[in-house]
Regions:
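Extracytoplasmic electron-transfer domains, predominantly the class I c-type cytochrome c fold
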Residues: 424-476
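The canonical Cys-X-X-Cys-His
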Residues: 286, 291, 399, 404-413, ...
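Thiol-/selenol-based redox modules, centered on thioredoxin-like
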Residues: 479-488, 593-651
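Structural microenvironment flanking redox-active thiols in thiol-disulfide oxidoreductases
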Residues: 526-580, 651
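Electrostatic cytochrome c docking/interface patches
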Residues: 379-402
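Periplasmic/extracellular electron-transfer cofactor-ligation site
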Residues: 394, 404-427, 450-451, 473-478
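Polytopic transmembrane helical bundles with strong interfacial aromatic enrichment
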Residues: 1-375, 380-382
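Short active-site neighborhood of thiol/selenol oxidoreductases, capturing the structured segment around
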Residues: 286, 508-536
Length: 651
């Protein structure tokens, strides 16, 4: 499958690149040599037709294999007309294949007409053929990872894939034709023609490399997820190999542009012929590297992106900006020295000065070593690992007994290091809250599994739940300063939970992110009915401000009927069973550093998923007036957007 995909991509790349080379490079360069142009046009058009035939054959085979893979049937069963017809009609891949087949058929007709075209028709037919080939190449983006995104991300990723393919076609696809022209046409027409072709192609190539670099950065943002994934995942390591080959291709292209092309026009004939031979050799080397790169791209296209896998760090050290003990100005000085040294290398290359080149490289290497020494910190295999378990009340509730059994005896109920077993230790256990917020998720998971406490009897799933409980402890500590005022902002993430309104579908709190504010009301029959009726009366105004009210009972016995008088049934929710005990963790205050037995509890949650305000009495002075609650909602509605609260632990 990988080889078939890579072969098909390579054939389409060569087809589009060859036609683009004819239109934008060869034809303008041979404007004064009509017989040579006609001969080259005939040869390249014939090659394009053969290439198109191979594209059609490989595309048909790829379609059959892919259809069998998607449906889980054998190749023999996948070759039946009925099965293939169903795939063509009922799947996105099939409909895209039909569209690509139509493009290929139109391209075949345009190429046949181009072979017999008169000079007046030639430009139009060549431009049409190139446009159809470019469309065929860009359509391959539909086979990339971009189509798995949604909304705006899908449009951006898909567009970046298409631009990347076009850049590959314009550069790599044109290299075989350039090598052919330099080997056959240039000796016949002259060195002046070779110079014009290479210079035109250099400009063409620089635009292509820029497009490849920019689109590659966008693609990496979606498929990598983080820089450590370049080293810590199979996808990232294969991408590193691709980038290495790309850098080698750029080096050959730079040698052609800055060293050998000037010698074609300025040197004696013998040296010019040597330069022409070097240009051909480097072009063939670029082509060979490009073919291997396409093979790697074919493998990357069918692999799970690094962003969707776990990063396993292979080294005992990593780099961390926050670890710098020296003043940050030292790093800026190192960066300035590196930039100056690189500039010296560029000057040395242009001036052909060995001293400048060697000196610049030495300073750059020294600055790099100094930066690594300053930023290096200990690392573990799980340093960049992310828990697959989201921060939810269900996970926190599962982690609570684990903490009580494994940690509380030394660390205490709230992680202060004041547990009953702490006095028997040589050193007091550390205060957990700052450690939880300051360390990466993967580092915490490693310590949970390898430190003295808890021991390795915990399974992976238990470690993930224990980590979420520790995160809830840290958030509850930060929430001690919450009151009925939404400002100032504090990084207190609201644990996610499921709920159901009447007989409607189950929903998640996280689904309200970016959409509405949430007023979460934990009520009791004895103390909250008047408050619920007041909220129901103000619901139209709350709706206009984008505030959704979710009222859940403190105990099952407190649940009110959906048809209770004066209470809006759209507010009454059946919650996750773990919601009340987990959100009760957020009742600690600066005055009372313990969980308070509440009769009524309200949280105002912003659109990013952060707890912003809290009222722990149905008659709280600030919220007893509905106007004050509405004022807090207006403040949140108008404030500048922040990054959403992480659904997992964030460093």
């Amino acid at each position: 499958m990988i080889l078939l995909r890579a072969a098909h991509f390579a054939l389409v790349v060569a087809l589009a690149g060859g036609l683009a080379f004819m239109l934008c490079v060869a034809r303008p360069a041979l404007a004064q040599a009509a017989p040579h142009w006609l001969e080259l046009r005939e040869r390249l058009t014939r090659f394009a037709l053969w290439d198109l035939a191979l594209v059609a054959a490989s595309g048909a085979l790829w379609f059959v294999v892919r259809a069998a893979e998607m449906s889980g049937v054998s190749l023999s069963d996948a070759r039946t007309p009925r099965f293939l017809g169903a795939v063509l009609e009922e799947t996105l891949f099939g409909r895209l294949s039909l569209g690509r087949l139509a493009l290929a058929a139109a391209l075949g007709g345009a190429l046949l007409a181009l072979r017999r075209a008169r000079p007046r028709q030639e430009t139009l037919l060549l431009a049409l053929s190139t446009a159809l080939a470019v469309g065929l190449l860009a359509s391959l983006a539909a086979a990339g990872h971009g189509v798995s995104e949604e909304g705006v991300d899908r449009a951006i990723h898909f567009s970046a894939d298409a631009v990347h393919l076009l850049g590959v076609g314009a550069w790599l696809g044109a290299l075989p034709v350039l090598a052919l022209v330099l080997a056959r046409t240039a000796p016949q027409v002259g060195l002046q023609f070779a110079t014009a072709v290479v210079r035109r192609f250099s400009a063409f190539g620089m635009i292509s490399v820029a497009a490849l670099a920019l689109s590659g950065v966008v693609n990496a943002a979606y498929t990598l997820g983080s820089l450590p994934a370049l080293i810590g995942t199979s996808y990232g390591r294969l991408l590193c190999a691709k980038l290495t080959l790309f850098a080698a291709m750029v080096a050959f292209a730079a040698a052609n542009r800055w060293r050998w092309t000037p010698r074609l026009a300025q040197a004696a004939r013998a040296e010019a012929l040597l330069a022409l031979a070097r240009l051909r050799r480097n072009t063939l080397a670029e082509t060979a590297l490009g073919v291997v790169t396409l093979g790697i791209a074919g493998a990357l296209g069918v692999m799970v992106p690094a962003a969707d896998t776990q990063t396993i760090w292979p080294f005992s050290r990593t780099l961390d900006w926050s670890a710098v003990a020296a003043p940050r100005q030292v790093l800026f000085a190192i960066g300035f020295a590196s930039a100056a040294a690189l500039a010296a290398v560029v000057v040395g290359v242009r001036a052909r000065s060995t001293e400048w080149i060697v000196g610049g490289i030495a300073v750059t290497a020294g600055a790099g070593v100094a930066a690594i020494w300053l930023l290096a910190v200990p690392a573990y295999p799980t340093t960049y690992l992310h828990s697959p378990v989201s921060y939810s009340v269900a996970s926190v509730a599962r982690g609570a007994p684990l903490y009580a059994e494994q940690c509380a005896v030394c660390h205490g109920a709230f992680g202060y290091g004041d547990g009953p077993g702490a006095t028997a230790l040589a050193a007091r256990p550390p205060y957990l809250t700052p450690r939880v917020t300051a360390r990466r998720e993967g580092e915490l998971l490693w310590r949970l599994g390898h430190a003295g406490e808890p021991n390795e009897r915990l399974a992976d799933a238990q470690r993930f739940d224990l980590l979420n409980y520790l995160r809830a402890l840290a958030n509850a500590d930060a929430a001690r300063r919450l009151d009925t005022q939404a400002e100032p902002w504090r990084p207190v993430s609201a644990p996610d939970f499921t709920f159901q309104i009447s007989t409607g579908p189950q929903e998640l709190l996280a689904q309200e992110r970016g959409r509405r504010l949430v007023l979460l009301v934990l009520y009791s029959r004895r103390h909250s009915l008047a408050r619920l009726r007041a909220l129901a009366e103000s619901k139209p105004r709350l709706d206009r401000l984008g505030v959704r009210v979710l009222a859940v009972p403190l105990t099952p016995a407190d649940a009110v009927a959906a048809d209770a008088g004066g209470i809006d049934p759209g507010m009454i929710a059946t919650p996750d069973a773990s919601l009340v005990p987990v959100y009760a963790m957020f009742t600690r205050t600066i005055v009372e550093d313990r969980q308070i037995a509440v009769r009524h509890l309200e949280f105002l949650i912003d659109r990013q998923g952060y707890l912003r305000a809290r009222a722990m009495d149905p008659g709280a002075a600030q919220w007893s007036s509905m106007a004050e609650l509405l004022r807090q909602a207006v403040i949140l509605d108008r404030e500048k957007q922040r990054l959403p609260a992480p659904r997992r632990h964030a460093h």
